[in-house]
Structures are given as C-alpha cells and as structure tokens.
C-alpha cells in the first residue's frame, strides 16, 4: 500500500496572474463556439477546474489550480462520472475482503443472480473494463450491489469527498431494480445490502432544473427535482482522479486503501481507447468509434486519433449536462495536466426529452477548449 511520502503539498492560485487568467483568455477566444458559451456561462452552468503539475529538480510534483465558476454548492447532475469512485471503492472493498480471508481478486469469476434471473458469470475486471470503455450501466449497477449505498457514501465522507453522494443506480438498465446476489467462486455471498440512508442535498442551489420534464412519457410543466439524485461536485470528482494519479500527494487518511497494483490497473483502463484491448469487441458497432467515452481532446473526432496523447478519464452525459473528469498526458513531450469541466446544454429547458445540444455545442466545446489548454501546456513546458 502507498505510504505517505510527504504531507499534502498543493498550491492553489487565487491571484490574478496571467496564467490564472488562462481559462478566461481561452473562453474569450475568437472561435465562435467557445466565445458563445462564455457569453452565456450562467445559462450553461459552466464550471472548469484546470490543474498544472509542476515538478522540482528531484521530480516531486505539486499542483497549481485554476478555476472558473467552480461552486461546490451549485448542483449539476454528475451522471456516469459517479462510476469512477464506484470502481475505485470496488477495488478497495476487494482488498478488505481479502483481509477477511476471502479468496478473491479482480480476476475471480463471480455469479450474479436475482430470484430466477441469472447473469453470465463475469470477473470484476470484465465489469470494470466495460465501465471505462463504454460506460456500461448494468456493470455499474452490479458493483453498486457489491458495495452498497451506505458503504459508498461513508467512504467518500471518510476521505474528505463528502460532496460525492450515491443515492440511486443508473438507467437505462432492464435489471435496474434487481438486488443482485453476488457470490465468489467459493459460493460465498459478497454482495452488500442495498438498505440505505437516502441523502437529501441541503445547502445546495440549482436543485430544480428546466421549465418542464418528461415522466413516464408525459410532459409535466414543472422543473425536474434533483434533491435525491446522485451528486458529485466538480472539485470532489476531480479529487478522485488526483488521488488515482498522484496518491502520494495526499496524507493517509485522505487516500483510498489501494495497492500499487490497484492504481496501475485503474490507470490502464481509464486511459484505454475503444479500439484497444477487449474494446475491440465494441468497435464492430458504429456508435463505438475510437475515442468513444472521451470528451476532452477527441470528443468531436470520430476518425483517427493522436495516440501520443492519453486521456485518463470518466465522463458523464444526462439531462442536458456533460461532464468530464480527466488527467491528460503526452508521454513523448512530457506534457501533463488535470482538467475537469461541466456544461449544461438544454436550450428548450425540457428535461428528459432527449433533445439536447450535445453534438453541436457541448461536446465540440469541451473538445476544443481542452485542445486549447493542451496547446498552452505544450508551449509552457518547452
């Protein structure tokens, strides 16, 4: 397990230096798409957190944060970004089970059943790979059954990420209401109770969104209420990925209980493109292009991509909100930085009607903005 090399060493820039204004200088770019989003930043609930990584002569890193409209108290729907901490805690829980003398690891085959319904046996590795490659809802929901809501929320609070709250599973999934019974290959039950203390998001704004919403096929002329939906603030979700990439920068009580092998496993799957590893099975379907599940850098590119630039990430897309939490690195040119952002693109203000400006506004914005940050980092490092 990781030992603390030194206490948390994070520098956050609040001054108005030229570099601090780099986010706004890009947002004010002449490119029409970026400028239009910036001019309507409140409407788009735009939040951006960009972190530079500086290293001293010995290679010790420190973080320098730049932020734009980041507000822990202003709600946005995190969607599938919640799957990142779910996967992390799954690996942590496997470590705990091994300490309790269970013979289990990511490659162990598990049986998954509910009443008369039985899924094909899978491994935790299979489930996690599906989550990172194609954001599989069903795989994520099995892991929620493995962890339990209360365990998840307690662990988030424990390491100082209390603005990440899990209240429900992911849809669409035909088996979303199944309380899966999970057993290891020794036929021992390893799933958790889904009994939960439902957490209401108090002291949080923007919990009612839209002018109308669709429910069970009918349009209701009232906002959609997110008080009991999943929650993840941009800063805390960004904190998850920072703990994965640079765990040594966090003191022991603020880290996940993971091994070096766990961290390497996470980094591998977070950075895969769809055409790599078992992802090749998905590329037979035209919707799963090479950079599927990557908004930053490649989001608006469905053709060949620059393999030198790796994006370690988990994105979310639902209810008109797009979010990406990422660490971006070019190993050949030694460029690396963290970038997390969320944007709301729902011009008609009707929630759950599947009419959102993802393809013509949200995704192109995130892709182009991140490329601009990348170019800035590239120039800064050389």
Give the role of each language-model region.
Residues 83-90, 131, 156, 237, ...:
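Residue-level preference for non-acidic, small/hydrophobic
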Residues 28-70, 339-341:
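A short, well-structured edge-of-sheet supersecondary motif
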Residues 1-25:
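Bacterial Sec-dependent N-terminal signal peptides
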Residues 43-45, 65, 71-73, 77-82, ...:
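Extracytoplasmic
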Residues 92-124:
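Short, well-structured active-site flanking segments
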Residues 76-102, 339:
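Active-site SXXK
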């Amino acid at each position: 397990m990781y030992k603390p090399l030194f206490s948390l060493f994070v520098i956050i820039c609040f001054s108005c230096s030229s570099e601090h204004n780099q986010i706004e200088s890009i947002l004010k770019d002449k490119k029409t798409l970026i400028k239009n989003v910036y001019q309507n930043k409140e409407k788009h609930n735009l939040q951006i957190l960009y972190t530079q990584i500086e290293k001293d002569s010995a290679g010790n890193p420190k973080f320098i944060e730049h932020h734009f409209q980041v507000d822990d108290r202003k709600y946005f729907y995190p969607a599938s970004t919640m799957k990142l901490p779910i996967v992390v805690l799954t690996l942590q829980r496997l470590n705990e089970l091994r300490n309790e003398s269970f013979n289990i690891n990511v490659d162990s085959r598990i049986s998954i059943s509910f009443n008369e319904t039985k899924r094909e046996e899978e491994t935790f590795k299979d489930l996690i790979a599906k989550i990172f490659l194609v954001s599989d809802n069903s795989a994520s929901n099995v892991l929620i059954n493995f962890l339990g809501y209360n365990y998840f929320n307690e662990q988030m609070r424990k390491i100082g990420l209390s603005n990440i709250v899990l209240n429900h599973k992911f849809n669409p999934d035909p088996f979303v209401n199944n309380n899966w019974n999970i057993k290891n290959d020794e036929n021992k039950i390893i799933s958790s109770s889904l009994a939960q203390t439902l957490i209401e998001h108090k002291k949080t704004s923007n919990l009612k969104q839209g002018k109308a919403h669709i429910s069970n096929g009918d349009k209701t002329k009232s906002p959609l209420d997110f008080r009991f939906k999943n929650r993840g603030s941009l800063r805390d979700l960004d904190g998850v990925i920072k703990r994965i990439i640079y765990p040594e920068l966090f003191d022991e009580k603020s880290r996940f209980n993971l091994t070096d092998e766990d961290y390497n496993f996470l980094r591998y799957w977070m950075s895969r493109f769809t055409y790599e590893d078992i992802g090749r099975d998905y590329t037979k379907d035209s919707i799963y292009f090479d950079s599927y599940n990557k908004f930053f850098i490649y989001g608006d590119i469905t053709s060949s991509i620059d393999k030198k630039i790796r994006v370690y990430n988990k994105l979310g897309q639902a209810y008109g909100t797009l979010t990406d939490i990422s660490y971006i690195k070019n190993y050949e040119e030694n460029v690396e930085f963290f970038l997390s952002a969320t944007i709301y693109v729902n011009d008609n203000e009707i929630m759950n009607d599947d009419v959102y400006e993802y393809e013509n506004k949200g995704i192109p914005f995130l892709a182009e903005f991140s490329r601009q940050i990348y170019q800035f980092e590239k120039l800064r490092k050389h």
